[in-house]
A protein has these predicted regions:
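Long, contiguous binding/interaction regions
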Residues: 1-80
């Protein structure tokens, strides 16, 4: 079966996020009042697998081996 998988990767709490800092500064310059702001990367992948659990495991392996650095990133996986 084919499963649509969404992977969201973000920095762990306490990690510096210079992109978010620049965006927050730009928003303030444009007159927008913002509080906390963080960035994340979203990947949508179509995975062929036997079931939802296998698709989730494949996505986890993709994160661990390529997309995420476990020292600085956290990730979530959604399987449809």
């Amino acid at each position: 079966m084919k499963f649509d998988v969404t992977i969201t990767i973000a920095l762990k709490e306490g990690m510096l996020d210079p992109e978010a800092r620049a965006i927050r500064h730009a928003l303030a310059n444009l007159g927008f009042a913002t509080g906390d702001l963080s960035t994340a990367r979203l990947f949508r992948i179509s995975i062929d697998a036997e079931d939802t659990a296998a698709a989730r495991e494949e996505a986890r392996a993709i994160c661990e081996r390529l997309l995420a650095n476990p020292v600085i990133h956290r990730y979530t996986i959604e399987v449809e």
